[in-house]
């Protein structure tokens, strides 16, 4: 039987970058708190956690790319909130941010985790940022730790 690989939830020694959208900050600040909570619980020191604020979700992939290619981080976590309005803007932004974040990870060969809420309403976004549906920021940071460790095991 061949080898089986998995990542562990031990963040000791990992360096993590968080890219956070300032737009809808009343939501994204909760995502950031959740992400920091997960990192701390799993042993990532505060000194090894950097935060880059961007104006909106659309700017997340560019800054994530710069951080991912810097060689300073084991993973990049992307946090934002895109809430549907009455125009097609939601579809354009959600689609491009999703594709951009995925492309950054593939191009950099680094875990670049999608922690962007795409919601039909403010209520849905609030639920996913720490109330009924858990905290997507916490989940994304946890995924970053696991995949960063998995990537180390694969080399």
Curated annotation (Swiss-Prot):
Family annotation (HAMAP family): Lumazine_synth
GO MF term list: 6,7-dimethyl-8-ribityllumazine synthase activity
Keyword NAD: no
Catalytic site positions: 89
Keywords annotated in UniProt: Riboflavin biosynthesis, Transferase
Name under which the protein is recorded: 6,7-dimethyl-8-ribityllumazine synthase
Family: Belongs to the DMRL synthase family.
Pathway listed: Cofactor biosynthesis; riboflavin biosynthesis; riboflavin from 2-hydroxy-3-oxobutyl phosphate and 5-amino-6-(D-ribitylamino)uracil: step 1/2
Example of a GO biological process term: riboflavin biosynthetic process
Any one annotated GO CC term: cytosol
Ligand binding ((2S)-2-hydroxy-3-oxobutyl phosphate): 86-87, 128
Reactions this protein catalyses: (2S)-2-hydroxy-3-oxobutyl phosphate + 5-amino-6-(D-ribitylamino)uracil = 6,7-dimethyl-8-(1-D-ribityl)lumazine + phosphate + 2 H2O + H(+)
Source organism per UniProt: Dehalococcoides mccartyi (strain ATCC BAA-2100 / JCM 16839 / KCTC 5957 / BAV1)
Keyword Transferase among UniProt keywords: yes
Residues noted as binding 5-amino-6-(D-ribitylamino)uracil in the record, renumbered to the chain: 23, 57-59, 81-83, 114
Gene this chain is encoded by: ribH
Role description: Catalyzes the formation of 6,7-dimethyl-8-ribityllumazine by condensation of 5-amino-6-(D-ribitylamino)uracil with 3,4-dihydroxy-2-butanone 4-phosphate. This is the penultimate step in the biosynthesis of riboflavin.
EC number: 2.5.1.78
Coiled-coil boundaries: none
């Amino acid at each position: 039987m061949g080898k089986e690989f998995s990542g562990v939830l031990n963040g000791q020694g990992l360096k993590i970058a968080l890219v956070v959208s300032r737009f809808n900050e009343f939501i994204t600040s909760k995502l950031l708190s959740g992400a920091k909570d997960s990192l701390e619980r799993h042993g990532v020191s505060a000194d090894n956690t950097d935060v880059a604020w961007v104006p909106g979700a659309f700017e997340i992939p560019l800054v994530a790319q710069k951080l991912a290619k810097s060689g300073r981080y084991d993973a990049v976590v992307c946090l934002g909130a895109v809430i549907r309005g009455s125009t097609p803007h939601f579809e354009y932004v959600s689609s491009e941010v999703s594709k951009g974040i995925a492309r950054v990870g593939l191009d950099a060969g680094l875990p670049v985790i999608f922690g962007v809420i795409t919601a039909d309403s403010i209520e849905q976004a609030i639920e996913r940022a720490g109330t009924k549906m858990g905290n997507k920021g916490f989940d994304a940071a946890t995924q970053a730790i696991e995949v960063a460790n998995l990537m180390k095991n694969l080399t």
